[in-house]
């Protein structure tokens, strides 16, 4: 874990070894001394960056049983886009739950043509969707994000794309430059006291600080929809970065 000389890394896999006295312990990790400067330099070279961000934040301690740290590359890229991290490795945004059943395209700052492409072909009266002031019935799986979270998830999407390209050696996925590019992408929503995320689709942005969605959607997260605070994350973030081992 870290080399005496920066740039010299084996690229192999380290298997977990558990001492006898730690086998049945709540925390299996062992205190170690590592060359953090070399770890960061190795990661910088691997990512193809000219320099690492001036300020990076990390957890004081790992809370899982095996206490396995994530790749430092992810922390470097998150810091590049000024993003925080939850203790499971994902990037979340918290909002108060606000039930909604109907909306107009202009209320969520999305053109009717884009909503029609997402399946909103008629308004709540059965008329063909042709303007931004028609009233639509929200689908149970769709989500309207607080406008304050729009830039946050633009930066998150850019982080995910850089992570795919620089760390995983794959093609970018989101190609997001502005908030409207997020419309139609999948998210994962969850309440703090439940163990499963609920799949959803981002369809627009509200001027309030709450997260608007169908009552059934909020109830799926937490069994009710009484205005409590829940979190959402980009689905690709959860698929790539969620870990029970951190």
Regions found by a protein language model. Give the residues of each.
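Conserved core architecture of multi-subunit DNA-directed RNA polymerases
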Residues: 1-246
């Amino acid at each position: 874990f870290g080399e005496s000389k920066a740039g010299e890394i084996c690229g192999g896999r380290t298997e977990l070894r558990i001492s006898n006295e730690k086998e049945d312990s709540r925390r299996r990790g062992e205190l170690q001394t590592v060359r953090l400067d070399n770890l960061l330099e190795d990661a910088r070279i691997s990512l193809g960056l000219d320099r690492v961000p001036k300020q990076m934040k990390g957890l004081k301690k790992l809370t899982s049983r095996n206490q396995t740290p994530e790749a430092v590359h992810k922390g470097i890229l998150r810091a590049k886009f000024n993003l925080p991290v939850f203790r499971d490795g994902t990037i979340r945004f918290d909002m108060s739950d606000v039930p909604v059943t109907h909306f107009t395209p202009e209320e969520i700052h999305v053109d009717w043509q884009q909503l029609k492409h997402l399946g909103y072909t008629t308004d709540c009266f059965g008329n063909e969707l042709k303007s931004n002031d028609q009233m639509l019935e929200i689908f149970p799986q769709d989500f309207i994000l607080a406008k304050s979270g729009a830039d946050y998830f633009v930066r998150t999407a850019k982080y995910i794309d850089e992570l795919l390209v620089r760390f995983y050696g794959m093609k970018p996925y989101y190609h997001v430059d502005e908030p409207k590019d997020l419309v139609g992408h999948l998210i994962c929503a969850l309440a703090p006291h439940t163990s499963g995320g609920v799949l959803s689709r981002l369809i627009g942005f509200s001027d309030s600080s709450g997260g608007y969605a169908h009552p059934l959607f909020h109830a799926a997260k937490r069994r009710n929809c009484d205005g409590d605070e829940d979190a959402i994350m980009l689905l690709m973030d959860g698929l790539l970065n969620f870990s029970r081992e951190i």
